[in-house]
């Protein structure tokens, strides 16, 4: 977007007197994205504004605003804080926390984290989302671009608002669930969020996508337990009948995995054959691959070809 297309900065400044140091950092269609600082507490924030008459392009309809206002009232260590949602002048806007941590889309800049840390990160986000699911608010747009990772291994932070609710699976890329891409589900469900968190966990554990890893279970690539394999494979099962029904079940199994994260040493495990047999539906202890679970996702193009491809998709455009 050229400078001539941007909203006048004096107009933005006058409409948002609670902010200072406002800087335009990107755009997506009619939506413009600014970084700024809250005057009240000096917190770094991100301001997203869309002309109200065009807000429907992104799904920013009255129902979206009502859901977002509910999110503003929530506070959890696994969720980025959403400070304000509403209308100002001709714009509909969202003001959210903007921490200085790298995004999961840029995780190659961070050192490898332990299985325990990866499990804790995803559990923390899952627990935060559960507070919203209990109010029948489902994200439906989780991607690595919306997940911040602290370099010190602390809590992951997920932006709890689906910024482009009208546009998945295009903007979600490989994190869109199979049922959303195929049209089997036309509204957001808990399972869609679970699928995205499960895929995030696989990548955090292995630094690979399932396809890059030949559909191997995490324990075939790193030292982790069967409990870790079980939680990951069930979360990303493309069959919604076999996937976790709710985040509570996922969190329960994550807790089991956190209690016993270590397992066999991946170096001592022979690599899976080039033509692995399709395992039975219910994962057995020690099973070495997730081939069965991901074949349907591969057919509809859900499983990412590579993490490099995924990152390129996620970082294309703007924040």
What do the PLM-derived regions correspond to, one by one?
Residues 104-113:
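AlphaC helix of the protein kinase catalytic domain
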Residues 121-122:
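Activation segment signature within eukaryotic-like protein kinase domains
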Residues 308-315:
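Conserved small/polar residues in nucleotide/adenosyl-binding loops
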Residues 81-91:
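Short beta-strand micro-motifs within the conserved protein kinase catalytic domain, predominantly
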Residues 89-102:
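Conserved short submotifs of the Hanks-type protein kinase catalytic core
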Residues 127-137:
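Protein kinase catalytic-loop region centered on the HRD/HxD motif
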Residues 171-265:
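C-terminal lobe helix-coil module of Hanks-type protein kinase domains
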Residues 36-62:
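ATP-binding glycine-rich loop module of kinase domains
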